[in-house]
C-alpha cells in the first residue's frame, strides 16, 4: 500500500486537486506545520514525502539543515576534491546523484559541473546500503552557512557537562574503497530518498485521531545532562533562557553557539537521505 502512495508534493497535489497553500503538511522531525514558503522550499529541494499513519510529512528548513549536519558528523565516509572523487568513482560528476551538504537540495547539472571546475571538496556520506556524495549548492556556498565553520561543533567535541551524549568522534575513520563498495546505483537500481525515523519520535494519536502534529513535550533534563538538538530539553548552563522549541528553535543556536550534543537515540534513528 505504501509503495502506491505519492512521494512528491507535486504528485500529491495532483491526486488531491488541492493547492500547496491548502495542503496540511507537517515536519516529521519537530511536528510543526510547514508554511507556504517552507512547503515550496521542500518541493524545490527534491526531497520525498514520508507517510505515517496515513498522513504525509516533510521537513522544515531548520530540521533539514540539522539533519544534514548530523549526517556529516555521524555518517561521513571520506572527503575528497572533486577531481579525485571522480577518479575514484569512474563516472563524470555531472551524472551523479548529489545533494547539498548544508541544505539537502538536489544539485543541478550546472552546479555539479561548477564543483568539478573549481575542484571543490566533496563529502561522501555512508547510508548503510549505499553511498551519496554531497557538495555545496550555489546558494549555500555564498551564504554564511556554506562555510564549514558554520556547522555545529567539531567531530569528537563534548559539551563538558555530561557523559550522556556527545558529537561522535570520527577521527579514527579511514577512507573507504568506493570501487569495492559500489557507489551507484542503490540496491534496487534506484537512489533511495527517504527520511528514516526510529521509535518514539511521533506524538501518539488520541481517541479522536488527533495528535499527528503534536510537538515534543517539555522535559526536565535533570542535573548533568545537556540538550540534544532533536530533543526539547534545556541545555545545561543556559540559565533562564528558554530554547525549548524543538529542533526548529534550536537550529539558530546550533549554528552559532558553543559546542552542543546529539543524544544516542537521534544519532541512531534520525537519518536524512
Curated annotation (Swiss-Prot):
This is Protein E6. Plays a major role in the induction and maintenance of cellular transformation. E6 associates with host UBE3A/E6-AP ubiquitin-protein ligase and modulates its activity. Protects host keratinocytes from apoptosis by mediating the degradation of host BAK1. May also inhibit host immune response. Pfam families: E6. HAMAP family: HPV_E6 (MF_04006). GO terms for molecular function: DNA binding; zinc ion binding. The gene is E6. SUPFAM superfamilies: E6 C-terminal domain-like (SSF161229). GO terms for biological process: DNA-templated transcription; regulation of DNA-templated transcription; symbiont-mediated perturbation of host apoptosis; symbiont-mediated perturbation of host ubiquitin-like protein modification; symbiont-mediated suppression of host innate immune response; symbiont-mediated suppression of host type I interferon-mediated signaling pathway. It is found in: Host cytoplasm; Host nucleus. GO terms for cellular component: host cell cytoplasm; host cell nucleus. Forms homodimers. Interacts with ubiquitin-protein ligase UBE3A/E6-AP; this interaction stimulates UBE3A ubiquitin activity. Interacts with host BAK1. The keyword Cell cycle does not apply. It comes from the Viruses. Keywords: Activator, DNA-binding, Early protein, Host cytoplasm, Host nucleus, Host-virus interaction, Inhibition of host innate immune response by virus, Metal-binding, Modulation of host cell apoptosis by virus, Transcription, Transcription regulation, Viral immunoevasion, Zinc, Zinc-finger. A zinc finger (unnamed) spans 27-63, 100-140. Transmembrane segments: none annotated. Belongs to the papillomaviridae E6 protein family.
Amino acid at each position: 500500500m505504501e509503495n502506491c502512495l505519492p512521494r512528491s508534493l507535486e504528485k500529491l497535489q495532483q491526486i488531491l486537486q488541492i493547492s500547496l497553500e491548502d495542503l496540511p503538511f507537517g515536519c516529521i522531525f519537530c511536528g510543526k506545520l510547514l508554511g507556504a514558503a517552507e512547503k515550496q522550499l521542500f518541493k524545490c529541494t527534491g526531497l520525498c514525502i514520508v507517510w505515517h499513519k496515513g498522513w504525509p510529512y516533510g521537513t522544515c528548513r531548520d530540521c533539514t539543515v540539522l539533519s544534514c549536519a548530523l549526517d556529516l558528523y555521524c555518517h561521513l565516509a571520506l572527503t575528497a576534491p572533486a577531481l579525485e572523487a571522480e577518479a575514484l568513482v569512474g563516472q563524470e560528476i555531472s551524472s551523479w546523484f548529489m545533494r547539498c551538504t548544508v541544505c539537502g537540495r538536489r544539485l543541478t547539472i550546472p552546479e555539479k559541473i561548477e564543483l568539478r571546475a573549481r575542484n571543490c571538496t566533496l563529502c561522501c556520506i555512508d547510508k548503510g546500503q549505499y553511498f551519496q556524495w554531497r557538495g555545496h549548492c550555489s546558494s549555500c556556498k555564498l551564504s554564511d552557512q556554506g562555510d564549514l565553520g558554520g556547522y555545529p561543533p567539531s567531530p569528537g567535541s563534548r559539551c563538558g557537562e555530561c557523559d550522556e551524549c556527545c558529537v561522535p568522534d570520527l577521527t579514527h575513520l579511514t577512507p573507504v574503497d568506493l570501487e569495492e563498495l559500489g557507489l551507484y546505483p542503490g540496491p534496487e537500481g534506484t537512489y533511495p530518498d527517504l527520511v528514516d525515523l526510529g521509535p518514539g519520535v511521533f506524538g501518539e494519536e488520541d481517541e479522536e485521531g488527533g495528535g499527528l502534529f503534536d510537538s515534543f513535550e517539555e522535559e526536565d533534563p535533570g542535573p548533568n545532562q545537556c540538550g540534544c538538538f532533536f530533543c526539547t530539553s534545556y541545555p545545561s548552563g543556559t540559565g533562564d533562557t528558554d530554547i525549548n522549541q524543538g529542533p526548529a528553535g534550536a537550529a539558530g543556536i546550533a549554528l552559532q553557539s558553543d559546542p552542543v550534543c546529539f543524544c544516542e537515540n537521534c544519532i541512531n534513528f534520525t537519518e536524512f537521505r
